[in-house]
Amino acid sequence: NELSETYNVSRVTVRKALAGLSELGYLYRKSGKGTFVAEKKIQRGITNGVLSFTDMCRMMNASPGAKITKIALEDPTEKEMELMSLDKDEKILVLERIRYADGKPVQLELNKFPESFSFLFSENLNDSSLYEILKKHNIILDHSQKTLDIVFATSKEAKALGISSGYPLLRIESVIHDVDNTITNLCRQLCIGDKFKFII
């Protein structure tokens, strides 16, 4: 009634408009409660290209954010040593961050780099684009191989993301290469599925 009177259109027209917006994902209905505006989803393509979280948010007019939860040098696994062609005594730099869109946590991000990337210790990695920082050091990320599966949030992951334990997450694991086809880092992302719209 209110929309019909405000815009001087028939109820049928209003119902059709609301149905159309619901189909497009802009609105959602709750039985017995009404129609509500849907939360904006971050669009990301599942390709072998490399697109930063920051750029994805900017494309959606969302404000990107990041908070470091861990940065340390650790011993690599045998698989990591082999993938990144590491020397026997070489460490890896482990960087864990929570990623935010418009101030809300939407993704956990784990990156592993060769020890030569230790310059990251002196960079401000909170609310910053990692890819832009790497570019500043003449490291241009170019392509990746990705694997995807569904996992369920541990209590620690759930607490970081503000969701319930056991909540389904999309896990994306990537092997990322630079323009010279050298592996720069291994990346694991745990995404809250209903915060993203994936394009294949």
Where on the chain are the PLM-derived regions?
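All-alpha effector-binding/dimerization core of bacterial HTH-type transcriptional repressors
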Residues: E39-I200
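N-terminal helix-turn-helix
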Residues: N1-V37
